[in-house]
Amino acid sequence: MTLLTVKHLTITDTWTDQPLVSDVNFTLTKGETLGVIGESGSGKSITCKSIIGLNPERLGVTGEIIFDGTSMLSLSESQRKKYRGKDIAMVMQQGSRAFDPSTTVGKQMFETMKVHTSMSTQEIEKTLIEYMDYLSLKDPKRILKSYPYMLSGGMLQRLMIALALALKPKLIIADEPTTALDTITQYDVLEAFIDIKKHFDCAMIFISHDLTVINKIADRVVVMKNGQLIEHGTRESVLHHPEHVYTKYLLSTKKKINDHFKHVMRGDVHD
């Protein structure tokens, strides 16, 4: 069953009249993971942020965005806020930017839960701890009393995921969630998303420039370049049998990097 339909989506910078995204179309079914790939500036993030109205006001949006039967572009800002977090959760690139540095992470998470649920304080704490345990966050009560600066980037990232899961959204949008992390933490966060994909009835849009990450988690893939969607299909067709020259370029670049790394590890790179 289709959860999200995006039709003829166009995003324009109203200050300069410059089109940033042009005539983008895609769908997402319930429980499916859609990978969105492309270089920096290709329009990946603003396309996905437009689903819940998180772009700056200067960016004008036209077209259709239908989420679970509701036209998102016809909603007022106050109506859209009801969808954010509860029905559509967003996991940002850097956990440090998602939390107010002057307040404990627990207080911020509790406030979000109170806005979107009718749970008591005790129920909220129990629910948050349950999902923090699920994501291997040790000593959750201590973490909830911590300020953001006291926690690592990987911990903050997993806290965002825990909060998202606690609200039981129909869709999680993950915007480059592994980019700002070290290699080991990247692996842990990616494994968390893969586990969510297996065990939760939740669709995901996973934005990344890392083709290895997308290959591990996506069911279908769309490729963006200069604000246009230039190729889409199953993970197998796009990442292993691409048709567009740009997709082939991305894949060949990734292969060259991997081959060079293998040569370095073998010690057969010479000046």
From Swiss-Prot:
User: Which EC numbers characterise this protein's activity in its record?
Assistant: 7.2.2.-
An individual GO BP term: iron ion transport
Domain ABC transporter intervals: 6-251
Q: Where does ATP bind?
A: 38-45
Q: What is the deletion mutant like?
A: Deletion of the cntABCDF genes decreases StP intracellular levels and decreases the import of iron, zinc, nickel and cobalt.
Q: Which PROSITE patterns match?
A: ABC_TRANSPORTER_1, ABC_TRANSPORTER_2
Q: What does this protein do?
A: Part of the ABC transporter complex CntABCDF (Opp1) involved in the uptake of metal in complex with the metallophore staphylopine (StP). May be involved in the import of a large array of divalent metals ions such as nickel, cobalt, zinc, copper and iron. Probably responsible for energy coupling to the transport system.
* Assembly mode: The complex is composed of two ATP-binding proteins (CntD and CntF), two transmembrane proteins (CntB and CntC) and a solute-binding protein (CntA).
Q: Which protein is depicted?
A: Metal-staphylopine import system ATP-binding protein CntD
- Lineage of producing organism: Bacteria, Bacillati, Bacillota, Bacilli, Bacillales
